[in-house]
């Protein structure tokens, strides 16, 4: 039948396509949310309890979306002893736009110049916070297609989330995540298990090309987020049940079947509400709920309609309480980065994934299914899942990816706490200068983490030049990921279809290393 899947299609696909390595970057300073409450003159607990936020990372005028992505990509390549010639696709998901024509990806190509590798597919993808997930799906689709040449795909999700002075400002943050996608991965994408919902909505958008600030309809944004979750979860449940039925399993899928459940996190409290929302869906979908002890005390809500409950405080309170243990077991750990650094837009949900991988051992993760809900305003949303490999032995791919993130909490704790008035001054400086030509950033580079790329200048033609703060640490982790390429740091296997120049493992750049996105 035209358009149908061949019966032997899976035999043609690479095995266990998924996330091989993951790197996260956030700036070296933050503002304390409790102190920000005092500075803003709001009730104590409005940000820390009401939103669930403890700290909010931010960047000075020395960092922009290009520098964030340069930093996270080079850190990933160095930490995993990867050669730049082993990347065949590079795609960036971001909504932080500093050029309406030139992509962030094209700026990242400067890192590949010395290798001579220019045969790299992919470009930027944009739809609010969903662009990173769209880029991930494109990478997976490339590897599972006739276009794949045997090399890795690299996905970068990054953003600077800032808001005008007011109620939305404490929901900001900044960061970037790089994901290495390939076969034989420790975190495997479940094939055929994506529940997607797309819809037209003006819940959050950025129509002013001269401003970094969005226009936000807060109430509509929450409704869109939760309604998209309802629909995505419904589609996902139907698809996995169909798979199970083919295997002889006639059970309904519920939250209990996820080992972990992570979600896009504008702020932590909304993620807790989203898990309660999924629990409500399970409750309404269970034909035998009156006999299921997990739903004890919820009988009065058996006839509610999902579309009537988005702002029903009684429903919200009851199901948050009833799902609290599930939240603690499956979701709470994923909020480490969100709680400590804030919203990272496209990279938010992947920061949540990093948080889980950083806090559990390979043995605790092995064999688990991780649910992932990605949401971008406007709107685009998908709920999909990752299956963790069973191999948790020392030196395994899973062991390597968790080891690479074991310092996540210490990195968060190593940042500098900045007073709210200094934070406000930095926000005003960005507001006044982010769009300027012929501009030299005013802030010092001394406070940046080692190995951080930063903005040196913007010339009179808006061309941006960057440099990297020297790093004294050796980022390499011995053999690296060691899957598609050789385990030897000085030998790398490029695409089997194309011979490109070989490059030894990248060393930290010298202090004088400068790159530019201009054609000069």
From Swiss-Prot:
InterPro entries: HMG_CoA_synt_AS (IPR000590), HMG_CoA_synt_C_dom (IPR013746), HMG_CoA_synth_N (IPR013528), HMG_CoA_synthase_euk (IPR010122), Thiolase-like (IPR016039). It is an enzyme of class 2 (transferase). Residues 486-520 are annotated as: Disordered. One of its GO terms (biological process) is farnesyl diphosphate biosynthetic process, mevalonate pathway. PROSITE patterns: HMG_COA_SYNTHASE. Belongs to the thiolase-like superfamily. HMG-CoA synthase family. The gene is HMGCS1. It comes from the Eukaryota. GO terms for cellular component: cytoplasm. It is found in: Cytoplasm. Pathway: Metabolic intermediate biosynthesis; (R)-mevalonate biosynthesis; (R)-mevalonate from acetyl-CoA: step 2/3. The modification Phosphoserine is found at residues 4, 495, 516. The modification N6-acetyllysine is found at residues 46, 273. (3S)-3-hydroxy-3-methylglutaryl-CoA binds at residues 43-44, 129, 167, 171, 221, 264, 273, 343, 377. Homodimer. This enzyme condenses acetyl-CoA with acetoacetyl-CoA to form HMG-CoA, which is converted by HMG-CoA reductase (HMGCR) into mevalonate, a precursor for cholesterol synthesis. Keywords: Acetylation, Cholesterol biosynthesis, Cholesterol metabolism, Cytoplasm, Lipid biosynthesis, Lipid metabolism, Phosphoprotein, Steroid biosynthesis, Steroid metabolism, Sterol biosynthesis, Sterol metabolism, Transferase. This is Hydroxymethylglutaryl-CoA synthase, cytoplasmic. Its EC number is 2.3.3.10. One of its GO terms (molecular function) is protein homodimerization activity.
């Amino acid at each position: 039948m035209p358009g149908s899947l061949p019966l032997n299609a899976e035999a043609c696909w690479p095995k266990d396509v998924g996330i091989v390595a993951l790197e996260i970057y956030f700036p070296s300073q933050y503002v304390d949310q409790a102190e920000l409450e005092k500075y803003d003159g709001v009730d104590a607990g409005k940000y820390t309890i009401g939103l669930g936020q403890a700290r909010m990372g931010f960047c000075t005028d020395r960092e922009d979306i290009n520098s964030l992505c340069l930093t996270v990509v080079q850190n990933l390549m160095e930490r995993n002893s990867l050669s730049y010639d082993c990347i065949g696709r590079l795609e960036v998901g971001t909504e932080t736009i500093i050029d309406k024509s030139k992509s962030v990806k094209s700026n990242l190509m400067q890192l590949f110049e010395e290798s001579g590798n220019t045969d790299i597919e992919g470009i930027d993808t944009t739809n609010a916070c969903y662009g990173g997930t769209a880029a991930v799906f494109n990478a997976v689709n490339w590897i599972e297609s006739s276009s794949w040449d045997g090399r890795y795909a690299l996905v970068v999700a990054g953003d600077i989330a800032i808001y005008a002075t007011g109620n939305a400002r404490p929901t900001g943050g900044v960061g970037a995540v790089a994901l290495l996608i390939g076969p034989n991965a420790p975190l495997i994408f479940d094939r055929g298990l994506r529940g997607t919902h797309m819809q037209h909505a003006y819940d959050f958008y950025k129509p002013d090309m001269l401003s970094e600030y969005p226009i936000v309809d807060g109430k509509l944004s929450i409704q869109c987020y939760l309604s998209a979750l309802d629909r995505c979860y419904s589609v996902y449940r139907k698809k996995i049940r169909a798979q199970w039925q083919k295997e002889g399993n006639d059970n309904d899928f519920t939250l209990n079947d996820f080992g972990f459940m992570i979600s896009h996190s504008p702020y932590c409290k909304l993620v807790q509400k989203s898990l309660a929302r999924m629990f409500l869906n399970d409750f309404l979908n269970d034909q035998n709920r009156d006999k299921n002890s997990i739903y004890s005390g919820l009988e009065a809500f058996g006839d509610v309609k999902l579309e009537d409950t988005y702002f029903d405080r009684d429903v919200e309170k009851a199901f948050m309480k009833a799902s609290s243990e599930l939240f603690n077991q499956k979701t709470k750990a994923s909020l480490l980065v969100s709680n400590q650094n804030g919203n990272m837009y496209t990279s938010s949900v992947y920061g949540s994934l990093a948080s889980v991988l950083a806090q559990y051992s390979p043995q605790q993760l092995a064999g688990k299914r991780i649910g992932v809900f990605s949401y971008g305003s406007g709107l685009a949303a998908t709920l999909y899942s990752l299956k963790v490999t069973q191999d948790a032995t020392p030196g395994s791919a899973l062991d390597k990816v968790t080891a690479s993130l074991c310092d996540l909490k210490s990195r968060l704790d190593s940042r500098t706490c900045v007073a709210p008035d200094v934070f406000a001054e930095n926000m005003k400086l960005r507001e006044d200068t982010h769009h300027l030509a012929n501009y030299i950033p005013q802030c010092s580079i001394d406070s940046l983490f080692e190995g951080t790329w930063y903005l040196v200048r913007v010339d009179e033609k808006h061309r941006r030049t960057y440099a990297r703060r020297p790093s004294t640490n050796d980022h390499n982790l011995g053999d690296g990921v060691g899957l598609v390429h050789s385990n030897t740091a000085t030998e790398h296997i490029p695409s089997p279809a194309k011979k490109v120049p070989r490059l030894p493992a990248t060393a930290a750049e010298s202090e004088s290393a400068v790159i530019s996105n201009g054609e000069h």
